[in-house]
Regions:
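E1/E1-like adenylate-forming module used to activate ubiquitin-like modifiers
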Residues: 2-82, 222-331, 335, 361-372
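N-terminal, Lys/Arg-enriched amphipathic/low-complexity engagement segments
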Residues: 72-113
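A short, basic/flexible loop-to-alpha-helix module at the beginning of a structural domain
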Residues: 102-136
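Glycine-rich adenosine-cofactor-binding loop
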Residues: 127-169
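Buried hydrophobic packing segments
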Residues: 147, 151, 191, 337-345
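Glycine-rich phosphate-binding loop and adjoining beta1-alpha1-beta2 segment
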Residues: 162-199
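A structured beta-alpha segment of the ubiquitous adenosine-cofactor-binding alpha/beta core
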Residues: 188-224, 230-237
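Oxidoreductase and adenylate-handling cofactor-binding alpha/beta cores
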Residues: 267, 272, 335-354
Length: 372
């Protein structure tokens, strides 16, 4: 039992005090004989109980004993319940306060074993255990939010650190995996909740006011990898200077023509920040004379104005006049997250990747046939 896990009394105190705006799952461990009291308490507090523990045990039996007969798997389930002394005491319960729901789950190690089972052997068990020791930071939670969830879902780390100061607006729903019931919430809250619903045991740390020069060192401390996806040009530049000094690898993907940057500072300590493409510190946004001037500066982080698509160029020329912001699509955000997941997995497993900056542009590989 972890020091932060709750018993029945601790759970009751938490429910009485915890705000429903929380993003953190809490782990509850019940003792044999707690069932009636627990059920009555949840009913009184209008907390939904979700209990599929026998189905999870059967799933675990199939993963561990793929050649076993149905009777042998049934015996595996019965033995697990008997060993706990009571079905309610098998494993643990995860309390999701924002959903007023408590979910019965396998214990931490069995949960990890089962949720990563279908990764095998694209990721081996030994690799998965190694990844479990890693700490990954994600700065900026638009494309970064999808990347964070991808990293969590593949279990590429044991702790993930999320940073963004922004809140969800309706116009974000064209690309972010969120719902209308989450409008106005912090993006850190939304992403942390998504991760908690996938794996409530995964350690999540949140910088809900984002990252600035004053807390950048704290954010980077102990990271094995930084996924950089923020919009602030100054912090994009500064974070690379500090990451290089600390030997922290940086990966960044833009939702524009499959743009990808891999900056493996751990093995390439003399690599210039962002491959030397942005040599001088950018100006603060308010110092740019026009919207298009700022947008052109932003495209330096996508390989330059000439490197973005014609449609994006036309759109950016209208920002501040007929359009309010940079065009972004859900499919491109998901594609970027997939690229980041691939690179993150290889870097975190110790592969000595070469620096890379360029486009993995699907339009290039799927050209339009010329008309006859």
């Amino acid at each position: 039992m972890s020091a932060t896990d709750l018993d029945m009394e601790g759970f009751a105190r938490l429910v009485a005090a915890a705000p429903q705006s929380s993003w953190q799952a809490r782990i509850l461990r019940l003792a044999p004989g707690d069932s009636n009291r627990f059920t009555a308490f949840c009913r009184e507090q209008r907390i939904v109980q979700s209990d599929t523990i026998e189905r999870q045990l059967a799933d675990l039996a199939q993963a561990r004993l793929p050649a076993a007969s149905p009777a042998e798997r049934d015996q595996f389930v019965a033995d697990a319940v008997a060993a706990a002394g009571d079905a309610v005491a098998v494993g643990a319960w995860a309390y999701l306060p924002w959903q007023a729901t408590v979910v019965h789950l396998l214990d931490r190690d069995a949960y990890f074993e089962l949720i990563t089972n279908r990764n095998r052997d694209k990721i081996t068990q030994a690799e998965q255990e190694r990844l479990r020791t890693k700490r990954v930071g994600v700065l900026g939670l638009s494309v970064g939010g999808e990347s964070a969830v991808t990293v969590a879902q593949e279990h590429l780390c044991g702790e993930i650190v999320l940073a963004d100061f922004d809140r969800l607006d309706l116009s974000n729903l064209n690309r972010l995996q969120a719902g209308v019931d989450e409008l106005g919430l912090r993006k850190t809250t939304i992403v942390a909740r998504r991760i908690a619903r996938i794996d409530p045991y995964l350690t999540v740390t949140v910088f809900e006011d984002g990252v600035t020069s004053s807390n950048l060192g704290t954010f980077l401390a102990g990271l094995d990898l930084l996924i950089e996806e923020c919009d602030g040009l100054l912090i994009k530049h500064e974070v690379r200077l500090q990451a290089r000094a600390l030997g922290v690898n940086v990966v960044y993907a833009g939702d524009e023509r499959g743009f990808l940057s891999v900056e493996p500072y751990a093995h390439w300590p003399t690599l210039r920040p962002f491959h030397g493409l942005v040599e001088t510190p950018p100006l603060p946004r308010e110092r740019y004379p026009t919207s298009i001037a700022f947008m052109k500066a932003l495209t330096e982080w996508l390989g330059g104005w000439s490197n973005i698509s014609e449609r994006s160029q036309r759109s950016l020329a209208c920002v501040g006049e007929t359009l309010c912001g940079y065009p972004q699509l859900a499919s491109e955000a998901r594609y970027a997250a997939g690229q980041i997941g691939h690179v993150a997995r290889r870097l975190l497993l110790g592969e000595r990747l070469h620096p890379f900056v360029g486009n993995l542009d699907l339009a290039k590989y799927l050209p339009v046939e010329d008309a006859c």
